[in-house]
Amino acid sequence: MEFILSLVGSLLLVICVLVSVAFLTLLERKVLGYIQIRKGPNKVGLMGIPQPFCDAIKLFTKEQTYPLLSNYLSYYISPIFSLFLSLFVWMCMPFFVKLYSFNLGGLFFLCCTSLGVYTVMVAGWSSNSNYALLGGLRAVAQTISYEVSLALIGFKILLFSFL
């Protein structure tokens, strides 16, 4: 019973995160529309509220294209893996229903966010384009250099919070 409750809680968490991101995108498009002195997306439904769902339908019905010389499997798996990594980050956040108990939730957060950049490198490598590969390697180098300082700052905060 505990496993089913945890599974339902995890599924509900994923659905709520994805829907909230869709509506935050709608909010961003509305704000950008008002900045440009236009209304933004307002053609679908009442004030454009169903627009994220229409965008999702349009996204799923689009034709899938890929570069001719690319490594097909890793080219499509890397964005999916990146999505799963970004959803795993939400597991260490405290909620009303305790999904998983992490003693080292901060370390789990740092690990998941640091792995996210490698999906960019795999996507660049699998496209068999030199420019995409260089962009992926540049993203990895930047992330590694910033993660060292981020980890040191985070561990310093954790260290001095117990004193």
Swiss-Prot record:
Signal peptide: none annotated. The keyword Electron transport applies. It catalyses: a ubiquinone + NADH + 5 H(+)(in) = a ubiquinol + NAD(+) + 4 H(+)(out). It is found in: Mitochondrion inner membrane. GO terms for cellular component: mitochondrial inner membrane. It is an enzyme of class 7 (translocase). It is a multi-pass membrane protein. Keywords: Electron transport, Membrane, Mitochondrion, Mitochondrion inner membrane, NAD, Respiratory chain, Translocase, Transmembrane, Transmembrane helix, Transport, Ubiquinone. GO terms for molecular function: NADH dehydrogenase (ubiquinone) activity. The chain crosses the membrane at residues 3-23, 77-97, 104-124, 143-163. One of its GO terms (biological process) is aerobic respiration. Its EC number is 7.1.1.2. Belongs to the complex I subunit 1 family. Core subunit of the mitochondrial membrane respiratory chain NADH dehydrogenase (Complex I) that is believed to belong to the minimal assembly required for catalysis. Complex I functions in the transfer of electrons from NADH to the respiratory chain. The immediate electron acceptor for the enzyme is believed to be ubiquinone. This is NADH-ubiquinone oxidoreductase chain 1. The gene is mt:ND1.
